[in-house]
Structures are given as structure tokens and as C-alpha cells.
Amino acid sequence: MASTSKPAASTTAIKKYYFYVLLCADQTLYGGFTDNLQRRLATHNAGKGAKYTRVRSRRPLQLIYHETFTDKSSALKAEYAFKHQSRAAKLKYLSAHDVKI
């Protein structure tokens, strides 16, 4: 007797990418990109992240905002756009997304 089996359900998770904003201890803002928010924040706070966040006076860093994307390109574009704004424009962007600093 032949056995019939159904194909296994796909367990492939959709990859997520994040654009995030950190508030530094010196009240400056840092925007970045990652595929793992918790790991990246821990790396920044350990002084092993981006050159900007390695400065001791900027730590600890606090995650104040993030956006989720299903493709890397969109997350990188969001990071690029944020980083090329003035501080006033960054604050306006965050305020429009209900982030209070």
C-alpha cells in the first residue's frame, strides 16, 4: 500500500530589517540599521557599535524609535534619509511618530 503524505508546511520566516533611532546620554540622536534590535542596542551600549556611539559620554543609549521593513534596501534608505537631516528635522520626524524626547 502506497503512503501519501502532504508536503511539510514552510517554516521559513520572513526576514525583518529595522531602522532605529537611539537617544544618547548627551541628548544627541543616532540613527542606524540592523536585523536584530536587541543585539545591536547591546553592542552599542557595550562600546563596540558605531564609532559615534563608542564615545563614553554618549552611553548609555536608549532605543526611542524603530521601523520594521521586510527588505534591507528600504531600511537602509530610511537610515540614510534620517542621517542626512538636521537635528530640527529629526526631532520633527520623531514628533510626527509620537516620540517624546
UniProtKB/Swiss-Prot annotation:
Pfam families (alphabetical): GIY-YIG
SUPFAM superfamilies per the UniProt record, alphabetical: GIY-YIG endonuclease
Domain GIY-YIG stretches: 15-92
Gene3D superfamilies in UniProt: GIY-YIG endonuclease (3.40.1440.10)
Lineage: superkingdom: Bacteria
InterPro entries: GIY-YIG_endonuc (IPR000305), GIY-YIG_endonuc_sf (IPR035901), UPF0213_domain (IPR050190)
Entry's family note: Belongs to the UPF0213 family.
Protein name (database record): UPF0213 protein lp_2058
Biological source species: Lactiplantibacillus plantarum (strain ATCC BAA-793 / NCIMB 8826 / WCFS1) (Lactobacillus plantarum)
